Every structure is written in C-alpha cells, then in structure tokens.
Design a protein with these regions (language model features):
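Intrinsically disordered, low-complexity, positively biased terminal segments
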Residues: 1-166
Length: 166
C-alpha cells in the first residue's frame, strides 16, 4: 500500500483493521524500516510478520554503480571485493565518499574491508547492514573501525522498498 505520507499510510491501515468484519489484513511488501513496524505493539503485534526478500541486486559495474547512488555519510575505505562472475568488479578499490557522492578507483593499498559483491550489493540498497555482516563473520575487517566507517556512508534514511513482484 502506497500513500503520500507515513501519516496517511497509517490512517489507511488503521481504517482497514478497524472494520468490524475484517479478521485479517495482509500486506505483502513492507520495507524493513517501514513506519508500520513502529505502529505495531511490539514484535508480536502481527501474527504472521516475516521478511520476504524479493528485491535483489547484482552490481555489474562496481565503480559506476557506487558513484551513481547518493550517500548519507562520508568515508575513505579500501575494500577488497570478490566477484567470481565478473572479474572486472573483483579486486581492491578505494571508496571515498564526501558530500553525498562517491569516487571509486582501483587501489594498491592494503584492504581495510574484505567482502563479496553480493554483500556490497545489499549495502548499496541501504538495507544490508555491513556492521551486522561483520559481527556475523561474513565480511572481514582489517582496520578497526573500517566497516563502521563504510556502513555510516552507505546507510540511508529510507531503505529500499521490496518490489510487489514481476
């Protein structure tokens, strides 16, 4: 359900759940940071709430993809990216973000973060938390604080919205 503002969206949803004969309301596409989650009375407020990952992305041209998106924070981090499908993406890159824009260039400096292209794609969407990935051991940090620096730059005020399907 799309609406012009969060207040309108919540008002429409409240109207739906307040109908006398309405036993359930089902929403198929809810973003990870949708205001609806704040409206529910805790994690058990929805009887069948579960994430559905129907929006995936494949970065094809890493430098252009990273330069094409906006950023909330800034960073200067050297990342080592693995990409078995597209060798042009693989390698060591310096990611410098300032003023909401990124400059990405090949680097011979020592890597500060090591991650796969899929993890970078998830962060590119703004919902793959790099700090959580690091804590889980799926990406590596060679310089203390480098993952946090990179994630602060990649975070967005509103995460990507899952598509309704194709």
């Amino acid at each position: 359900m799309l609406a012009g503002s969060a207040a309108v969206r919540l008002a429409l949803l409240r109207r739906l759940v307040d109908f006398d004969l309405m036993a359930t309301v089902t929403l198929k596409t809810i973003g990870a940071d949708d205001v609806l989650w704040q409206w529910l009375p805790g994690p058990r407020g929805a009887s069948d709430a579960h994430p559905y990952d129907n929006l995936w992305i494949r970065l094809v041209d890493l430098p252009r993809a990273l330069a094409a998106r906006g950023y909330e924070g800034s960073c200067d981090v050297v990342v080592d990216v693995t990409d078995e499908l597209l060798p042009a993406n693989a390698g060591t890159w310096r990611v410098t973000v300032a003023g909401g824009e990124a400059v990405v260039s090949p680097s011979t400096d020592a890597a500060e973060v090591r991650l796969g292209i899929a993890h970078l794609g998830s962060a590119w969407l703004g919902w793959g938390n790099l700090s959580a990935m690091h804590r889980a051991g799926v990406i590596a940090e060679e310089r203390p604080g480098a993952v946090s620096d990179l994630w602060r730059a990649f975070r967005l005020d509103v995460a990507a919205w899952p598509s309704p399907g194709f």
